[in-house]
């Protein structure tokens, strides 16, 4: 809840100190804009100060903004719009997003299993009418858990599985699931603590997975749901087919049982807590062995030119182990799910081709995108 004493002071005395900050928040939030929006709140009571706290606390963060509900993006559009435009490659406030979940349009190419260890597609979805994780109250969070877990328990055939509440899970089991990359980590990072997303942990949180452990749903991590399809090897089409089928089933069961739908609009696509995930929310990734590419100074630049993102073996801010990298789509907003997945397939094929050439001591100059 906002401090009611705040209104006794002029907005200029409340403006954050952005000295040494690198975020898009610090670039676009002016004193005049802050004065205009400081005392405004969304219908559920989320304020500008809550939306920017994540960035105020962390000078090194790239964005520095989090939504507390679906309306955050319209009520505070003066700030969010320019941040979204710069982060999402020029996506303007007049642009519309496009959605395409047709698995038949995914390229048939199976990525070379000698280089690709595993493939994964994930997205986030939030339930309309409920606050997002920086602003959600305990009763809402528990209602989301009940709603989603009951919908998931309706899945059948190869998607049939079980829900595991973190409240009922012992520490050893929880850590094993984290180590196996099935479960999200405990919310101890600055992103979660500053953003108010670690509150009440592990209350209302859990993981659901099918019997084969290749279709998973995280409940109440950063978003209400994180829906994940994954498997060993490089058959991304198979991964995406299961992903879309499971996603469609979950949405249908939630709507049939509760009348609720996912947050979505024509402009931003699927509405998620962090502006970086707006649009498809899709992160299509592979773990690929690229030890020779890692020694090439152009590696990151090559990935960026192909609209790919390179991370360490265990994700963002981690190092590569044994030359294994996490390679994923860079874009989320303005292009469809099918386009983003196909971008990864095509790009990783090129990276593997480069790796093979480097193994033989050959030049990759002819393969480097201009």
Swiss-Prot record:
Q: What is its EC number?
A: 2.7.3.3
Amino acids binding ATP = 118-122, 181, 226, 283-287, 311-316
- Could you tell me which residue ranges the Phosphagen kinase C-terminal domain spans? 115-358
The record lists the catalysed reaction(s) as: L-arginine + ATP = N(omega)-phospho-L-arginine + ADP + H(+)
- One MF annotation (Gene Ontology) recorded for this entry: ATP binding
Gene3D superfamilies annotated for this entry?
ATP:guanido phosphotransferase, N-terminal domain, Glutamine synthetase/guanido kinase, catalytic domain
> What keyword terms does UniProt attach to this protein?
ATP-binding, Kinase, Nucleotide-binding, Transferase
* EC class name: transferase
Q: Does the keyword Transport apply?
A: no
Q: Where does substrate bind?
A: 222, 274, 316
Residue ranges of domain Phosphagen kinase N-terminal in the record: 6-89
For this chain, the Swiss-Prot or TrEMBL PTM comment says: The N-terminus is blocked.
One of the protein's GO biological processes: phosphocreatine biosynthetic process
Q: Which InterPro entries match?
A: ATP-guanido_PTrfase (IPR000749), ATP-guanido_PTrfase_AS (IPR022415), ATP-guanido_PTrfase_cat (IPR022414), ATP-guanido_PTrfase_N (IPR022413), ATP-guanido_PTrfase_N_sf (IPR036802), Gln_synth/guanido_kin_cat_dom (IPR014746)
**A GO cellular component annotation in the UniProt record:** extracellular space
Q: How does it assemble?
A: Homodimer.
Task: State the family named in the UniProt similarity comment for this chain.
Answer: Belongs to the ATP:guanido phosphotransferase family.
- PANTHER family (alphabetical): ARGININE OR CREATINE KINASE, CREATINE KINASE M-TYPE
**Record protein name field:** Arginine kinase
Organism listed in the record:
Stichopus japonicus
Gene name of this polypeptide: AK
């Amino acid at each position: 809840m906002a401090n009611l004493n705040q209104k006794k002071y002029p907005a200029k005395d409340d403006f954050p100190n952005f000295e040494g900050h690198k975020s898009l928040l610090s670039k676009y939030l002016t004193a005049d804009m802050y004065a205009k929006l400081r005392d405004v709140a969304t219908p559920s009571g989320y304020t500008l100060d809550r939306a920017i706290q994540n960035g105020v606390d962390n000078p090194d963060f790239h964005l520095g903004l989090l939504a507390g509900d679906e309306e955050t993006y319209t009520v505070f559009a003066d700030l969010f719009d320019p941040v979204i435009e710069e982060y999402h490659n020029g996506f303007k406030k007049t642009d519309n997003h496009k959605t395409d979940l047709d698995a038949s349009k995914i390229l048939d190419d199976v990525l070379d299993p000698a280089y690709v260890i595993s493939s994964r597609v994930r997205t986030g979805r939030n339930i309309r009418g409920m606050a997002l994780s920086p602003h959600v109250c305990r009763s809402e969070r528990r209602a989301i858990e009940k709603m989603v877990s009951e919908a998931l328990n309706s899945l059948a055939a190869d998607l049939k599985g079980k829900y595991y509440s973190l409240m009922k899970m012992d520490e050893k089991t929880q850590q094993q699931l984290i180590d196996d990359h099935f479960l999200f980590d405990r919310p101890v990072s600055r992103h979660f603590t500053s953003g108010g997303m670690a509150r009440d942990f592990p209350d209302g949180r859990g993981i659901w997975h099918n019997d084969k452990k290749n279709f998973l749903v995280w409940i109440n991590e950063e978003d209400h749901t994180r829906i994940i399809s994954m498997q060993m090897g490089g058959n991304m089409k198979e991964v995406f087919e299961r992903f879309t089928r499971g996603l469609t089933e979950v949405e249908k069961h939630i709507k049939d049982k509760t009348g609720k739908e996912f947050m979505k609009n024509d402009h931003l696509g699927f509405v998620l807590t962090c502006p970086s995930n707006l649009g498809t929310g899709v992160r299509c990734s592979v773990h690929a062995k690229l030890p020779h590419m890692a020694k090439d100074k152009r590696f990151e630049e090559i990935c960026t030119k192909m609209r790919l993102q390179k991370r360490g073996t265990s994700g963002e801010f981690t190092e590569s182990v044994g030359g294994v990298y996490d390679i994923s789509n860079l874009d989320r907003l303005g292009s469809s799910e099918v386009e983003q997945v196909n971008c990864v397939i095509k790009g990783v094929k090129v990276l593997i081709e480069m790796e093979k050439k480097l193994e033989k001591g050959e030049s990759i100059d002819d393969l480097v995108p201009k």
